[in-house]
Design a protein with these regions (language model features):
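Hydrophobic alpha-helical transmembrane segments
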Residues: 1-29, 35, 146, 150, ...
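Membrane-proximal soluble regions of multi-pass membrane proteins
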Residues: 37-134
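Membrane-water interface of transmembrane alpha-helices
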Residues: 28-44, 108-110, 222-231
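Interfacial loop-to-transmembrane junctions
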Residues: 239-243, 273-299
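Transmembrane alpha-helical segments of multi-pass membrane transport proteins and ion-pumping complexes
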Residues: 24, 28, 32, 147, ...
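Functional transmembrane core segments of multi-pass inner-membrane proteins
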Residues: 4-7, 19, 157-272, 309-313
Length: 313
């Protein structure tokens, strides 16, 4: 029985067609992650704020120079907690998917990756509002990523693992581009998964190099940011960028790869930042840096970290 299951996984699931199907399903889930994770992170922040406002001990630790929370602060905390409770649980699985325009629940047969979008003629079956092209675009992109690794690596467990790494980076890039947010849930999960994969011998580097890459990925941009803030009074990057590069370092291991990704990201982001500054002047807001880090990292993973390292060495 075990040999049959192993052969089924190798011949069917990990084949190129099987990985395409797996990628379409993964792309559908990735759309949920991209859409819901920022809201989940925002709800977490509101919940933490309400707990801080309603707990005198936590308030005194956070604001030692201020008096205990006033009646108005307590009332605001109660309002926040009430609003969160009234809206119900909000996770990757709850509530069920619904049309953002008419709030009509999406039936299971309307949620089949790519096919439902084509069958519904790109419109909601309830209100007729157009369904964004982003959803099938993500599904097709993820399917192509899974197919690429199935073709390049063959029917091995490493193929879906590295495809999942690319998908996580893709999700972080899209979220940061849309919301200027790199959720800790995703960056930290990617970081710890990279360290665990190295420790278990699943990655292309061992645990010591994975730890080195993660530390290098966090400390170098953090030191750049400290220097920029101190000498130029300008922030270089945010904490989410440090965590993202640390996660990339955990998977790639070699500091030279992490450094190359950072250099490419800086040189590609700089022209966009200068154009933004020229257009908007001093009022220009900082552009999200996550996509500039994620894009070269995805390219390195697609080509193969070992191959890129041999070129750079």
């Amino acid at each position: 029985m075990l040999s049959f299951l192993r052969e089924f996984v190798d011949v069917v699931v990990l084949s190129v067609p099987g990985m395409v199907v797996l990628g379409l399903i993964g792309g559908s889930f990735l759309n949920v992650v991209i859409h819901r994770t920022p809201t989940i992170a925002e709800r977490d922040q509101w919940e933490q704020a309400s707990l801080l406002m309603s707990d005198p001990q936590a308030w005194s630790l956070a604001f030692p120079d201020l008096a205990a929370p006033s009646v108005a602060v307590d009332a605001a905390a109660a309002d926040i907690q009430g609003a969160l409770a009234k809206s119900g649980p909000y996770t990757l699985s709850q509530p069920g998917s619904a049309c953002p325009k008419c709030s009509r629940r999406i039936r299971w047969y309307e949620n089949v990756p790519l096919l439902s979008w084509l069958w519904l003629r790109r419109r909601c079956s309830g209100c007729g509002s157009p369904i964004s092209w982003r959803y099938p675009a993500v599904e097709v992109t993820v399917a192509m990523i899974f197919a690429w690794f199935a073709w390049r690596l063959g029917p091995v467990p490493a193929a879906p693992m590295w495809a999942a790494v690319c998908c996580a980076l893709l999700a972080l890039a899209v979220i940061d581009a849309q919301t200027a947010l790199l959720p800790d849930r995703l960056t930290q999960a990617l970081l710890w998964a990279g360290l665990a994969a190295a420790a278990l011998g699943w990655s292309w580097v061992g645990a010591p190099l994975a730890v080195t890459g993660a530390a290098f990925g966090y400390l170098v941009p953090w030191l750049c940011d400290v220097a920029m803030r101190r000498y130029l009074a300008l922030p270089a990057m945010a904490a989410g960028d440090f965590q993202l590069l640390a996660a990339i370092g955990a998977w790639l291991g070699q500091p030279v790869l992490v450094a190359a990704i950072l250099v490419v990201a800086i040189f590609t982001a700089l022209p966009a930042a200068l154009l933004r500054l020229r257009r908007d002047g001093p009022a220009a807001s900082a552009a999200p840096f996550g996509p500039y880090l994620a894009a070269p990292a995805i390219l390195v993973v697609l080509v193969g970290p070992a191959a890129v390292y041999d070129v750079l060495r």
